[in-house]
Design a protein with these regions (language model features):
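Membrane-cytosol interface at the C-terminal ends of specific transmembrane alpha-helices
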Residues: 96-107, 114, 143-195, 202-210, ...
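Periplasmic/extracellular loop-to-transmembrane helix junction in inner-membrane transport proteins
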Residues: 12-35, 50-87, 106, 260-272
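C-terminal transmembrane helix and the adjacent membrane-cytosol boundary/short C-terminal tail
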Residues: 10, 104, 166, 170, ...
Length: 308
């Protein structure tokens, strides 16, 4: 056998070993990632199931009322505060993301803005709560109110929406922007009619995360929206402190109510049942909002695909 044949056989054997090792490594990593995904899915199912089962185990219809043991007022306050915070944070977050993606030039200013956004997203919510208390309560001379709470939650939500908007626009193919500009459209028209609609599904992901932050927030609201809730459901005068839609009244949310029942509810024999039921309702509320927003995202994506 010639030296050339030996080299060819050795090369084939080496190549076969490399292929076998690559396939083995691929199977191992596939198994690891599959197990990790399966584990997280099972963990989420078990956690959600546990919260829902324990929450509805001692269910009492009175829990859904506006009575002392009911959470109707807290449920309304939670939804109302999240809506207020999204009204503030969504336009600002999308606008900031568009500026970073399309208008800001690479340099120190852009780096500073990105570092500031990252720092803001990592701040503990208790710090935002104290900031909100100093600025929105003490400096304005107002009492605890839902509007101050929504401003605090908006500060926590802004980095999420800004980052997702910036990432969504930057990830779009360049042909979207170039094709629109080639037809004579301005940059503003391109952003409004081309880039934002195409990036909307991913932007809604940021909105979902922002809403989830609002639904579950407690520390920031402890110093801004307050722990008292006095609502008169027959009073719809917006200037009245008992009107449900008055944003300048104090309003305890579900997350705060859970904390109060767990820490200061020793005088209420139903405190544990109320806290677990409130937790279950909060989970259902967050899941419902996520599902609705996801369906909106899917419809927008299908509409964009049909239009293209």
């Amino acid at each position: 056998m010639s030296i050339l044949e030996n080299q060819e056989r050795l090369s084939e054997d080496t190549e076969a070993k490399v292929i076998r090792h690559a396939r083995l490594a691929d199977r191992i990593m596939t198994g690891v990632f599959s197990f990790a995904g399966w584990f997280m899915l099972q963990f989420l199912i078990l956690l959600t199931g546990y919260i829902l089962i324990t929450g509805f185990m001692d269910f009492d219809p009175a829990f859904l009322s506006a009575s002392k043991n009911g959470i109707l007022n807290q449920l309304f306050n939670t939804v109302y505060l999240v809506i207020l915070s999204l009204i503030i944070s969504v336009p600002l977050g999308i606008g900031s993301g568009v500026y970073l993606a399309e208008y800001a030039k690479p340099g120190r200013l852009l780096n500073f803005l990105q570092i500031s956004i990252e720092s803001l997203s990592s701040l503990p919510s208790i710090v935002i709560g104290l900031f909100g208390y100093l600025v929105f309560i003490l400096m304005t001379g107002m009492k605890w109110n839902l509007f101050a709470g929504s401003l605090a939650v908006s500060i926590l939500s802004l980095p999420l929406i800004t980052t997702e908007t910036n990432s969504a626009i930057r990830s779009l193919p360049k042909e979207y922007k170039e094709g629109s500009l080639a037809t004579g459209a301005t940059l503003a028209q391109t952003i409004k009619h081309v880039l934002l609609p195409a990036a909307m599904p991913q932007i809604l992901t940021g909105v979902i995360m922002a809403a989830g932050r609002g639904f579950g927030e407690a520390a920031a609201l402890l110093y801004t929206s307050g722990q008292s809730t006095v609502i008169n459901w027959s009073n719809w005068n917006l200037t009245s402190p008992t009107c449900p839609l008055n944003p300048f009244r104090a309003g305890e949310t579900l997350s705060l109510h859970i904390w109060v029942m767990r820490t200061e509810g020793s005088l209420n024999p139903n405190a544990t049942a109320i806290a677990t039921f409130s937790s279950a309702i909060l989970v259902l509320l967050t899941l419902s909002f996520s599902v609705i927003t996801r369906r909106m995202s899917d419809r927008i994506q299908k509409k964009n695909q049909k239009g293209s």
